[in-house]
């Protein structure tokens, strides 16, 4: 592709290597005023490469000089004089530099692509950071089937700001297990367990579907129950036991329980804020103990559909509901005995249940009875919660 250089610029080729700028200026200066004489030299040897460019102030003078001097001899060599085009070397220097430059931007784009790869890199690096968040998110929310869809925001926030999303992914994805971010309110006060909790949840997920069924059952059974006054009264000691000794199982069950409590929007957040961790931790632990037997005594593990779940609990509410007088004594006996029977049926030695500190037994009797019967019925009315469950 031959482009004409600027008007008034002449290309002089076939020069003797001895010809210099002064000789050119002398020869061509008689046609008009010369603006520039450019003798092309070898970079290394600094010798003339045999051609030059002479730029006249007036394009008309350049045309005259080209017409007269083309083919004439200069310093013993016939020279070629014509309107300068952007020669290949100069295209190489100016033209191709745009290609290099234009290739540069593609390289920049490649860098842009690589850059997006780069930006993809940091998020993926963040992703690795987040892999903690994501894998937790996966594990925890995978223990509750549909939630990963709802947990979409943590991954999205994970993309742009991995560092932020890793913690929020932690809290939110661990709350993702429960299904709602609001529990991060309740849960932030327990900064420890959410981080420890992914492992149990992973254990839940992969241990057996039945166990997971039970843990969801726990979450619902204990969902209704942490609101009983008994659990709040007894909260502090069991919190010490469950948080320290049974942290995994209790925290595992606690978070589903509080997750579902929060998810159902029954104001459980307030219940939890009333007795922040003790009740629900202990309760979830109790429900964990019970869940292994209670589902057996109640029937099949809950289906994951909402209606049967609520039917189950509404029936359990009706079945075990009533005044605190009735459930506090008889129901506690019933459930503690059911617990032992269920453990024996499942092949768990009864001693497992008795092996925990004695305070747990005393609390388990009251809370095991109290939550079951009292959750919606006794304790809610007792707490003056005139709100209808539904």
UniProtKB/Swiss-Prot annotation:
Alphabetized PROSITE patterns for the sequence: RRM (PS50102)
UniProt biased composition (Low complexity): 158-169, 323-339, 354-371
Entry-linked Pfam families: RBM1CTR (PF08081), RRM_1 (PF00076)
Residue ranges, compositional bias (Basic and acidic residues): 62-80, 194-215, 241-274, 380-390
Cross-link (Glycyl lysine isopeptide (Lys-Gly) (interchain with G-Cter in SUMO2)): 80
Biased composition (Gly residues): 107-120
Major subcellular location class: nucleus
Keyword Membrane: no
Signal peptide extent: none
Name of protein: RNA binding motif protein, X-linked-like-1
């Amino acid at each position: 592709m031959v482009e004409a250089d600027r008007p008034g610029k002449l290309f002089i080729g076939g020069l003797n290597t001895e010809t210099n700028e002064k000789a050119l200026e002398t020869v061509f200066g008689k046609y008009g005023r010369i603006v520039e004489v450019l003798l092309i030299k070898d970079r290394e040897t600094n010798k003339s490469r045999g051609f030059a460019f002479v730029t006249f102030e007036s394009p008309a003078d350049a045309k005259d000089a080209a017409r007269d001097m083309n083919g004439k001899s200069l310093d013993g060599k016939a020279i070629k004089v014509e309107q300068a085009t952007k020669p290949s070397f100069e295209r190489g220097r100016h033209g191709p530099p745009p290609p290099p430059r234009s290739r540069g931007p593609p390289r920049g784009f490649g860098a842009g692509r690589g850059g997006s790869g780069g930006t993809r890199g940091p998020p993926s690096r963040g992703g690795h950071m987040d892999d903690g968040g994501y894998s937790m998110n996966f594990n925890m929310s995978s223990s509750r089937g549909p939630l990963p869809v709802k947990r979409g925001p943590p991954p999205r926030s994970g993309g742009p700001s991995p560092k932020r999303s890793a913690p929020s992914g932690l809290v939110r994805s661990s709350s993702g297990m429960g299904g709602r971010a609001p529990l991060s309110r309740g849960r932030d006060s327990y900064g420890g367990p959410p981080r420890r909790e992914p492992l149990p949840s992973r254990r839940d997920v992969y241990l057996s579907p039945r166990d997971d069924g039970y843990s969801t059952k726990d979450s619902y059974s204990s969902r209704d129950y942490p609101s009983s006054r008994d659990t709040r009264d007894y909260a502090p000691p069991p919190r010490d036991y469950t948080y320290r000794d049974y942290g995994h199982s209790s925290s595992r069950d606690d978070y589903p329980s509080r997750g579902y409590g929060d998810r159902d929007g029954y104001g459980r957040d307030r219940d939890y804020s009333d007795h922040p961790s003790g009740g629900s931790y202990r309760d979830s632990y109790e429900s964990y103990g019970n869940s292994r037997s209670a589902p057996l005594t109640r029937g099949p593990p809950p289906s994951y559909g909402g209606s049967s779940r609520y039917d189950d609990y509404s029936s359990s509410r009706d079945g075990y509901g009533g005044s605190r007088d009735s459930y506090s004594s008889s129901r506690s006996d019933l459930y503690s005995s059911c617990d032992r029977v269920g453990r024996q049926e499942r092949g768990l030695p009864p001693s497992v249940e008795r092996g925990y500190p004695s305070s747990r037994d005393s609390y388990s009797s009251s809370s095991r009875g109290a939550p079951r019967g009292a959750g919606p019925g006794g304790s809610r009315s007792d707490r003056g919660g005139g709100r209808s469950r539904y």
